[in-house]
Swiss-Prot record:
Tagged with keyword Nuclease: yes
Species in which this protein is naturally found: Haloferax volcanii (strain ATCC 29605 / DSM 3757 / JCM 8879 / NBRC 14742 / NCIMB 2012 / VKM B-1768 / DS2) (Halobacterium volcanii)
Protein name, per record: CRISPR-associated exonuclease Cas4
Lineage: Archaea, Methanobacteriati, Methanobacteriota, Stenosarchaea group, Halobacteria
Function according to Swiss-Prot or TrEMBL: CRISPR (clustered regularly interspaced short palindromic repeat) is an adaptive immune system that provides protection against mobile genetic elements (viruses, transposable elements and conjugative plasmids). CRISPR clusters contain sequences complementary to antecedent mobile elements and target invading nucleic acids. CRISPR clusters are transcribed and processed into CRISPR RNA (crRNA). This protein may be a 5' to 3' ssDNA exonuclease. Plasmid targeted by CRISPR locus P1 transform wild-type cells very poorly.
Keyword Oxidoreductase listed: no
């Protein structure tokens, strides 16, 4: 089966209510794929982190207290939580732009998912309220190819029997999985 077929099969499984995908991909999985593939593997294999840590609580607080009156939250297919602005754009809120590509890819995945699975075309806004920064995000031919490459990558990583090779990254020291990697 070619890699294109993997994405097509994923889309078919998602669109057909009588089928479900082998791997129900979430936005967080897409983000982890672009941050650290080991982190993705751990999370996808049931090795989850403590959601009460300071960094996660800070992110939750920024998300919950920003743009409150101009957006509504929706849960799509019991796994993808979207915020829709009054303008109709999909919004993703992050504390910092330090990991901009993973955040952007997460939002692009949401836009791709809406278009491919639900035939809904939307544009996006990536917001960093603590930095007073916003970026428009559009799903086009190039970004669609990036998302589909990411979907292939996520399916590959999650399907492995063991985590990907250890790779030292600048943010390993603040990663909640660091004890699993560096003990």
């Amino acid at each position: 089966m070619s890699s294109t077929d993997v994405v097509e099969e994923y889309v078919q499984d998602e669109r057909d209510p009588s089928r479900s995908p082998n791997v129900p991909i979430t936005g967080l999985m897409v983000q982890y794929y672009h941050v650290c593939k080991r982190e993705l593997w751990f999370m996808a294999n049931g090795i989850d982190i403590d959601r009460e840590t300071t960094n996660i609580q800070r992110g939750t607080h920024v998300d919950e207290t920003s743009y409150g009156t101009s957006r509504r939250s929706f849960m799509i297919d019991n796994r993808i939580q979207l915020d829709i602005l009054d303008s109709g754009d999909v919004m993703e809120v992050k504390v910092s732009s330090a990991l901009e590509k993973p955040a952007r890819m997460q939002l692009l995945f949401y836009l791709w998912y809406l278009r491919e699975i639900h035939d809904i075309d939307k544009d996006g806004v990536l917001a960093y309220p603590t930095e007073r920064k916003r970026e428009s995000v559009v799903l086009d031919e190039t970004t669609t190819a990036e998302v589909e490459s990411t979907v292939r990558g996520v399916l590959d990583v999650v399907g492995r029997d063991s985590p990907p090779q250890l790779e030292k990254k600048p943010y390993c020291g603040t990663c909640l999985y660091q004890d699993l990697c560096w003990m």
